[in-house]
Amino acid sequence: MARLKSLYNEELKQQIKEELGLANVMQVPKITKITLNMGVGGASQDKKLLEGAVADMTAIAGQKPVVTKARKSVAGFKIREEWPIGCKVTLRGEQMYEFLDRLIAIAIPRIRDFRGFSPKAFDGRGNYSLGIKEQIVFPEVDFDKIDRIRGMDVTITTSAQSDEEGRALLKAFGFPFK
């Protein structure tokens, strides 16, 4: 079992229940999924860029990403409908907790000039989104083998009903907020 999953089940559930003043342990919010998204701007001109992004995302997530395609044509961006423009992967269960553990313990401390995540990035329903500017903060990505520095979006979806519950959950996991 993943380290953070057992920690959540054995200690954090009770701690969050008391902190939020909930009556039942089943009301305690939990993380339902983590979605990683990488938009590849030049993928419409150069298909190799997308292959590099897929390789990086596979190494980071431990799961092959799905290629996202443009929903409609936009002349200003020089893209057409159905053209590949990025990749995304959704993590659930054990892989989700393993990724969250690596994100908190290894990747976040390697971010340059990091002062904590903004507490304002909650969406009103307890879900949190953050951006990572460089994929090289993850140790799985070999610095010598990358073709270019890419960023990614990480969305942590929780079962929380409010931002306050979501913040309490992520803080219990050790998320560094400002």
Curated annotation (Swiss-Prot):
Signal peptide segment: none
Record GO cellular component, one term: ribosome
GO biological process: translation
tRNA-binding among keywords: yes
Protein function: This is one of the proteins that bind and probably mediate the attachment of the 5S RNA into the large ribosomal subunit, where it forms part of the central protuberance. In the 70S ribosome it contacts protein S13 of the 30S subunit (bridge B1b), connecting the 2 subunits; this bridge is implicated in subunit movement. Contacts the P site tRNA; the 5S rRNA and some of its associated proteins might help stabilize positioning of ribosome-bound tRNAs.
Family to which this protein belongs: Belongs to the universal ribosomal protein uL5 family.
Protein name: Large ribosomal subunit protein uL5
